[in-house]
Amino acid sequence: MQIVRRAVVGVYGVLAFVLGGMVSWIGVRMGIGMWVGALIAFGVFAWGMWPSWRRWRVARQPFPTAWRLWLEAHVPFYRGLDAVGRRRFERDVQFFLDEQRFEGVGVEVTETLRLAVAAGAALLLHGRPNWELPARRTFLFYAGRFNEDYDEDALGDYEGMAHAQGPVILSAKAVEMGWAVPHDGDNVVLHELAHLFDFENLDADGIPTLLNPASAEAWRRLMRAEMVKVRQGRSVLRRYAATSAAEFFAVAVENFFERPELLAHRHPELFEALCAFFNLDPRSSGQTQG
């Protein structure tokens, strides 16, 4: 995540120039001068750069010690980063917390719950500083499991659910457990955030939008082969990964970050594909692929 994105500067710079130039030309023709056009150009550019200015302000804020201690205790990847990597990870956490909405249904939205989700986003984006989490979201917390009607149900099928449009729903209990046991390949935050990369295609198909189009067919073939292994019980991924391509991608992401050594040993081709996609090797924090 970046404070200033070059693409945004370029788009709003051109837009400000064109609109300002047109209004200035009209102003000169009408005898009122160019000042209105200049004012409009400034307003358009300032409006476009507002999110960058806000991020700049957020980045200048100190990172709370309590947050840092939580990351050290629950996110092994963060512990392995050098000082520069840690600061970037922390900054991404701050950006995420400032820009996303968090609400609770019968449960208090604690600082820990918010931080737990932000840590997942910072982890997924760490190897790609120029990436952003697709779309701003509301993260809705339930106390425990829920059913397909979004009612709390101790026997419900869901601990998390992401929508192409709409909130990401998470069980508060599952969020806490996901980080309490960081090496079991079961983390609802990473799972649901992974779905957001997939939803940009409109139809969740297990092929994330940010994947290089030239690699899409190879990834599709790899997914099919790995899903067969899951169905046959020859995979480190839990059986839920075989229910659909979208769920395969999400479960694979969980294991990539939580059990990288095991995934690399048992499924080297899958591991290398995810290393290329996320541009990092989670076995060695901070080591990007290029």
Segments predicted by a language model, with ranges:
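Metalloprotease/metallohydrolase-associated module, dominated by Zn2+-dependent proteases
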Residues: R5-G13, W50, A119-R128, G144-A180, ...
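Alpha-helical bilayer-embedded segments of polytopic membrane proteins, i.e.
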Residues: R5-M22, D82
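Active-site recognition of the HExxH zinc-binding catalytic motif
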Residues: D82, H183-N201, A250
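Hydrophobic (often cysteine-bearing) scaffold residues that line and stabilize catalytic clefts
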Residues: L113, V181-D186, A246
